[in-house]
Amino acid sequence: VPAQDNFVFGVAKTTGITSAEQWLAAKTAVKFGAIAAGDGTYDTSKVVEVALGLPIQIVSGYKGTAPIRLAFNSGEVGGLSNSWQSFRSTWRKELETGEVMIVLQLSAKPHPDLPKVPLAMNLAKTDESRKLIQAVAQAHGAAVRPYVLPPGTPKDRVDILRKAFMEAIKDPELLNEAGKANLEINPGSGEELERNVRELLRLEPSVVARLKEILK
């Protein structure tokens, strides 16, 4: 995996919400722009709405995050769940002016840029809620954009390619070009990817059923 996503939740300054605690206590739902079920913008928003009881009104049907950004800046929606990597590269102006506030992270651990922004998993009140959040975080984070090989590929070949990939992704020229484009190279090894996928495949039937119900 060349880059792992860290999904975060950004809300508009105009909502008056500056923290997850304020959001949880809000009486009015924040309209969140989303693409559709199956996309990270929708799935991550829906799972925290259900698992944490966050007041969110999902407005889906946008054709991408660029139209959602336009809707955000026009006041049509008041928030978005997207990867921090995307926020940092395409929402720089809104972040610098404080027009968007990052108040919650969906990932398993805080992104180094956001050490004080709480994790959704830590706000969950039940074991089921934590499992729901963890599953969606893995599916749209650590296991996103995988490089895969066909079944039956000899293990020695897999090992060679895994090692070569991780060495290539550390190439100084590549990292320099990525830095110029404000893109984050945040690789996950083949072993980590395999572990994450196996964990998703081992989800309890009750959790799978609940996710199907939530993310339909």
Model-derived features: where do they sit?
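Short beta-strand->loop
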Residues: 1-2, 55-61, 78, 91-140, ...
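Hinge/capping helix and adjacent helix->loop/strand transition within the periplasmic-binding protein
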Residues: 1-67, 71-74, 124-131, 140-177
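Short, well-ordered beta-strand segments
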Residues: 31-33, 80, 103
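An extracytoplasmic/periplasmic, membrane-proximal ligand-sensing/linker region
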Residues: 97-99, 103, 116, 125, ...
